[in-house]
Regions:
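Short secondary-structure boundary elements
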Residues: 1-161
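Generic leucine side-chain signal with a strong bias for well-ordered alpha-helical environments
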Residues: 11, 42-45, 213, 217, ...
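Alpha-helix C-terminal capping/helix-coil junction sites
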Residues: 46-47, 195, 211
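Tandem amphipathic alpha-helical repeat scaffolds
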Residues: 72, 109-114, 128-130, 144-155, ...
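Tetratricopeptide repeat
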Residues: 107, 126-127, 159-169, 203, ...
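Short, Lys/Arg-enriched, disordered terminal segments
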Residues: 144-168, 172-175, 180, 199
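Small side chains
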Residues: 166, 187, 191, 203-206, ...
């Protein structure tokens, strides 16, 4: 049998989430519907084997039974509608990220999907910086807390990802203040990595580019960090 308009609406909302979804998250996009009605719709969709319940502890989440069906539902919606949903969710997770940095990949995901490149890069940098630290020039060392996050976005927590991101940011044509700030950070990260790997010429060149941008932006903390790298490099070379 066919699905009702309300059921279709719930499936549309669910399709914009990358992973499992709580009822509170569905309610964000289904503002006009009360919870009991929504629960009944979710039950009917489960009976039709379109979605399933996932229990995490005592928390109930929902997800599509088949990824391919989720993609089909997603693609059938207008770009305007999808973009609006992604914007609403990006703002929601952005507010949550102040207390809980593990939602940052979701902020990145939704900003990326509504084509806000600057915000997507800003939050990706913030997320990766939360995860990585440089200890004794071994770049990067994963914080132990990273393992608590699970594997949903584990792929983002790789050194290769950070360096790829650095390249993408450095190659951006945009010259706004935010982008220059990000380029400054990425040159610094690349510089530290290169120096740690023994590629001193490239490392120092990146640190110098970071210094140039930091001076333009009056970013004193960043300048200090760059100068420290130059000092470490001098010590290492002797």
């Amino acid at each position: 049998s066919g699905i009702s308009q309300d059921e279709k609406e719930v499936l549309d909302c669910m399709s914009v989430f990358p992973e499992k979804i709580s009822i509170e998250e569905i309610e964000l996009l289904m503002k006009g519907m009360d919870r009991l009605t929504l629960l009944k719709i979710l039950e009917r969709l489960q009976e039709g084997f379109l979605i399933k319940e996932v229990l995490v502890g005592w928390n109930v989440y929902y997800k599509f039974v088949h990824r391919i069906f989720q993609e089909y539902i997603y693609e059938k919606q207008s770009n305007g509608k999808k973009q609006l949903y992604h914007k609403m969710l990006a703002a929601y997770y952005e507010a949550q990220a102040e207390q809980d940095f593990t939602v940052l990949p979701l902020v990145v995901y939704h900003y990326d999907k509504c084509h806000d490149q600057v915000k997507a890069y800003q939050y990706q940098i913030r997320y990766l910086k939360e995860f990585y630290t440089v200890i004794n020039e071994n770049f990067p060392v994963l914080h132990t807390e990273a393992s608590d996050f699970g594997d949903d976005f584990g792929v983002m927590a790789e050194a290769a990802k950070m360096l790829e991101l650095a390249e993408d940011v450095i190659n951006l044509k945009d010259d706004s203040r935010e982008i220059r700030q990000m380029k400054m950070e990425m040159h610094y990260i690349k510089g530290r990595y290169d120096i740690a790997m023994g590629d001193y010429d490239s490392g120092i060149a990146n640190i110098e580019k970071s210094i140039f941008l930091a001076q333009k932006l009056n970013a004193h903390k960043n300048l200090l960090a760059c100068y420290k790298q130059q000092v470490f490099h001098g010590i290492q070379r002797e």
